[in-house]
């Protein structure tokens, strides 16, 4: 009996994570998510209506929850060890099929989407069961919480594949509700995570989303490259760079340190759930909506945007900023009035953006974001310096912003 135990222990320890550094396989896995994001943008671009935007965001929400589950998983399991690597490759293949079926996920490829999505989620649970076999608290969370919500969500998406219209939309909505409501219903106790690794994974996925906005510029400019297209491309890069700055200059640093300081267990898990699993979705969704707006702007520089597209470009950026406001409230319990006011102004400008030439609307967006960054950098220069260069002063720096 003892010999069996001594041989089992090394096999288990070989797949448990020992380092906070993001591994190459995790980055490789995220490349599939790049395609999935691109496909969500393509779905909305093919149907530039309010319904099309709703479908794209619903798919993005479902894909995000699958990805977020793997972010939690790889805080426990080393994806590059043992059979875990092979299961991760299989999950990548399933995720790729999901991404390929996204553009027609509500029609001809609905059943394929549901089956492939189910495979992604099953692989996720299988690896968590492996990692939790000597951890009763984690195993209980996996079986009762994750297993239950996953079964309901996947089952509803499968049922939705057999329907259409309002019933299909309702089934999708309930599936999303089960996924996102599960962690609140079953609680955050029992889960494990490595704070620095977890924060870094989400920062990298936001970079991937921002990369999609750059790709959208290139796709939208696939034609005659005249002066208007060049100016629009430069403004598009400026907007994407501004969104990068707003997150990575200070916010990401403070949030990562705050998560690392949280007491391991329930406090840290709830903070990770709220700040990263939940609040990074509207950030990513905002960037995806912006990418849609950039693509259409580059295609029609001198024309006005459709109302839904204007709302996507300015409203998506506003969503990104509002997510930052909520992110800060959850992390350091203070309110950022400057980003909130900028988001509100962008929402008010949507009707104007729908009648102006697309290039003018993009210029207004770039100008407002630039003014916001300059204001914060000048007004809070000392606090910014403490956060970026003096970690000991970080705790008092962010709340003053």
Question: Where in this protein do the model-derived segments appear?
Answer:
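Extracellular/periplasmic helix-loop-helix junction of adjacent transmembrane segments
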Residues: 45-50, 54
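Loop-to-transmembrane alpha-helix initiation sites
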Residues: 166-169, 358-367
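Short, amphipathic C-terminal "tail helix"
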Residues: 353, 367-377
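Alpha-helical transmembrane segments of multi-pass membrane proteins
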Residues: 32-42, 357
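Short hydrophobic/alpha-helical segments at membrane-entry points of transmembrane helices
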Residues: 109-113, 171, 361
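Acidic, carboxylate-rich catalytic segments that either coordinate divalent cations
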Residues: 400-401
